[in-house]
Amino acid sequence: MARPLPLNKDLIVCVPSNYSNTSRGKFFENFCADILRRQSYRIDGMEVRKSGMEIDIQATHTPSNEKLYVECKFMQQKVDSSVVDLAFSQAFRLRVKKIALFSISDLGKDAQSTLEDYRLDERIDYSFFDKKEILISIIATGKVEDIPTDDIPAKYTS
């Protein structure tokens, strides 16, 4: 049966309304750390303070022993270029060659351009996980079940 509209999968992360911004951030950091653990990363530290900066997650890929610096942003507004710049500069100062930025929101226009510029720099491997990438990751880990489009009754429309 042909569908008139394509179905888009989305990720909505819900936290209790009484959570403070700090509690929301910690929840999301733990959520991201769990995804990384299921991708063969060992979590070396959470909210690590070094040389005047805070690192949300420090991890090591166990098969390759490569270090990963992770920045987590749990916010509704688009990520701006200052966040992308900050993650790059902190990873560079720490001499970490892999960066992952996790966010439930998209990159703003300037942030997208900034990320593309950094991805051209061969010294650092910079990954961005938006909610679509995060959803793919948690489906791959088996934490949530992916429902095939054909299994969704046709009476549900967007």
Where is each model-derived feature located?
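Mixed-charge (Asp/Glu-Lys/Arg
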Residues: 1-158
